[in-house]
């Protein structure tokens, strides 16, 4: 994948053209890394809710949630991964929207939007959160703290503490830390409670 990334000339072109990344996502989906995130999401959002998988890639999380009784829409840039997702939906006889973010933004009104292992790929983390907040009544997102041994520059270093403070300034429903460096938050957009901010100030939300 390193050769493909270098040849593409950077992040934007890489994610829109990479076929190797499709296989990387497939292996990652099989690892079970995101299962705790899905458990937290489904713990707070009941089956039947309309969810948005933002930065969906091959759509493995959304397909799991459809099987669990949720209505799921998908959003990402048009690329080999989303074309594979469309094929997976057809093979299952499922009719679910797949929004091309180069052409349109998903509508507001979803019950929840989630983005797992996505925000570290975008140039503007807070702008990305604003996009999520415009789509749904609840946001579920994780913030990765990078390790020194990242093989290639696929991930951007995130201001994790500031992102956690942003979530705490909203109506924070849940915070969890997984795998040592993945900070998961579930919150509702809008001005938050003093309790959420006090929890952060007291050190109960640590990065």
Label each residue range with its predicted role.
Residues 122-135:
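A short, conserved alpha-helix within the catalytic core of class I
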